[in-house]
């Protein structure tokens, strides 16, 4: 088959496009990045737990992602540095999650055109996640002091150059949505901190570091 024949050109363009699909935006640092937005009155050190709920059944987030993100958010923006004593529990619970893939019809169109649009950054599809989570604050005895709810959404494009790879996009969509939900909860904790702090301090120190039914890192 000659390269300059129609079939040869089609094969060459398709091979080039498929090889280039790996040239997507880097996710390096994206999963570990935590914004700095410290609340006005930090809470005392707490045991940090997480229940991924329906997120555990999603194809995107890794099992350790909810706890890791929650822990990073609290340690950077909400809690005082931990030494040895803790004065209660902070528990993240993911209550709702829905991820949809849109634009997949574009893939069929691009196959017909030998993926040439992909070479120029045309999207293949989007991963969109809607998520709801709540944070429960408890004293050392496990008594609930307050529940704070947030919602997050995301839309992650799968594309060369201007988007992310098909491998990373589902996880990134879940992580962005969860991070947005935590960002909504942060100002609620800021407002409640003047009430929560004395209740946690007077409740004493934690003797059992892990709440039943929770995960702890």
Predicted regions and their residues:
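Sec-dependent bacterial lipoprotein signal peptides
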Residues: 1-24
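A structural "domain/chain start" motif
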Residues: 22-86, 94-101, 151, 194-217
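C-terminal/domain-edge helix-coil "capping" segments
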Residues: 29, 124-132, 144-217
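Surface-exposed short loop/turn segments
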Residues: 93-145, 167
């Amino acid at each position: 088959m000659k390269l300059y024949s129609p079939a040869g050109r089609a094969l060459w363009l398709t091979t080039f496009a498929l090889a280039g699909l790996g040239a997507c935006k880097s996710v390096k640092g994206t999963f570990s990045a935590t914004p700095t937005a410290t609340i006005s009155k930090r809470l005392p050190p707490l045991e940090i737990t997480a229940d991924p709920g329906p997120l555990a059944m999603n194809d995107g987030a890794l099992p350790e992602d909810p706890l890791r993100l929650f822990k990073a958010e609290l340690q950077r923006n909400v809690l005082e540095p931990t030494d040895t004593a803790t004065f209660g529990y902070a528990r993240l619970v993911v209550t709702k999650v829905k991820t949809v893939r849109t634009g997949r019809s574009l893939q069929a169109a691009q196959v017909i055109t030998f993926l040439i649009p992909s070479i120029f950054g045309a999207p293949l599809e989007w991963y969109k996640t809607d998520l709801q989570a709540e944070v429960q604050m408890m004293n050392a005895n496990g008594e609930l002091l307050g529940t704070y709810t947030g919602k997050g959404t995301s839309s992650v494009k799968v594309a060369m150059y201007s988007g992310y790879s098909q491998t990373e996009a589902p996880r990134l969509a879940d992580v962005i949505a969860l991070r947005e939900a935590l960002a909504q909860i942060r100002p609620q904790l800021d407002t409640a901190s003047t009430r929560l702090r004395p209740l946690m301090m007077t409740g004493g120190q934690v003797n059992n570091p892990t709440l039943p039914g929770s995960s702890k890192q």
